[in-house]
Amino acid sequence: MVEKHLLEFLEKLQFLIAKNVKISHYGIENVKKICGVDIAYKGNLGFSVGVSMDINSGDYNYKSYVGEVNFPYIPGFLFMREAPLMIKAIEGLDCHLLLVDGHGIAHPRKSGIAAVIGVLLDFPTIGVAKSRLTGDLVNESEITYVYLNGEKVGVKFGRYFYSPGNKVDLQDCIELGKRGYPKVLKIADMLTKKTKKE
């Protein structure tokens, strides 16, 4: 159980982070090294893995971080559970763009975990999520957009939702989504499960 005053405080924090999100075209076709970060749980332990992958060769290296998670799962406040561990898992990894398992600005306060991490690290991030948290789906020119209060905040490809976190734009998300679910996140997901079993 989380006190109402704490959630109200966290909402204000999210609105502040959202104001600091920079939406600008990155050009993912220029990315040479891409990072992905994911997390798995066993009890109150979180197992986070950050993966840095060379786009051309597919070679990768990774880093893991295990820590206790005491904040409960509350939709819209995922960053309180996962961001601290994810940030530790990607420290020191070499990459130009970070993909986060979660939402960017396709979030009720435009401050999903990919936006939070992107702003805190001042780094280009894209959120890739498995389910829609907010907004309406609208098909335009063979692309399914996520609209929030009349604004395009994300896109859907297959069963996945892509949204800007920081220092990227919707076009970058479209270019990423067209390629299929990112391999670097598949690897991160596999390694979190492996780390959890060890």
Swiss-Prot record:
One of its GO terms (molecular function) is deoxyribonuclease V activity. InterPro entries: Endonuclease-V (IPR007581). It is an enzyme of class 3 (hydrolase). Its main location: cytoplasm. It comes from the Archaea. The keyword Cell membrane does not apply. GO terms for cellular component: cytoplasm. Keywords: Cytoplasm, DNA damage, DNA repair, Endonuclease, Hydrolase, Magnesium, Metal-binding, Nuclease. One of its GO terms (biological process) is DNA repair. Its cofactor is Mg(2+). DNA repair enzyme involved in the repair of deaminated bases. Selectively cleaves double-stranded DNA at the second phosphodiester bond 3' to a deoxyinosine leaving behind the intact lesion on the nicked DNA. This is Endonuclease V. It comes from Saccharolobus islandicus (strain M.16.27) (Sulfolobus islandicus). The lineage of its organism: Archaea, Thermoproteota, Thermoprotei, Sulfolobales, Sulfolobaceae. The gene is nfi.
